[in-house]
Amino acid sequence: MIKLNFSRELRLLTPLHFKYVFEQPFRASTPELTILARPNNLAHPRLGLTVAKKHLKKAHDRNRIKRLCRESFRLAQYKLPNCDFVIVAKQGIGKLDNRTLTQTLDKLWQRHIRLAQKS
């Protein structure tokens, strides 16, 4: 049976991990969201999140976005290539409702799966 957890090993934890992804990423974007990816040498994908106070002033709004992103990653992790992913929230992300945000994330994950198959 497949475990759909989001343990510590599936997270980008240090600034070095984030810096690695930001150096030469593959990108998939919408106006509200960008997912950056870079292949890693591990047997699983990892996720990092950046949601700036500049775009979402209230902590509960930032937490909602991060919670939905983590949940989307958790459910898609076995389809995803072995890459380090960083989700960058942009201006206007707070206007998306939960369903729209989830659909947007699913579309971006599919785009990264296709990008990984091409390379």
Curated annotation (Swiss-Prot):
One of its GO terms (biological process) is tRNA 5'-leader removal. It catalyses: Endonucleolytic cleavage of RNA, removing 5'-extranucleotides from tRNA precursor. Gene3D superfamilies: 3.30.230.10. Its EC number is 3.1.26.5. One of its GO terms (molecular function) is 3'-tRNA processing endoribonuclease activity. SUPFAM superfamilies: Ribosomal protein S5 domain 2-like (SSF54211). Keywords: Endonuclease, Hydrolase, Nuclease, RNA-binding, tRNA processing. InterPro entries: Ribosomal_Su5_D2-typ_SF, Ribsml_uS5_D2-typ_fold_subgr, RNase_P. It comes from the Bacteria. It is an enzyme of class 3 (hydrolase). GO terms for cellular component: ribonuclease P complex. Consists of a catalytic RNA component (M1 or rnpB) and a protein subunit. NCBIfam families: rnpA. HAMAP family: RNase_P. RNaseP catalyzes the removal of the 5'-leader sequence from pre-tRNA to produce the mature 5'-terminus. It can also cleave other RNA substrates such as 4.5S RNA. The protein component plays an auxiliary but essential role in vivo by binding to the 5'-leader sequence and broadening the substrate specificity of the ribozyme. Belongs to the RnpA family. This is Ribonuclease P protein component. It comes from Pasteurella multocida (strain Pm70). The gene is rnpA.
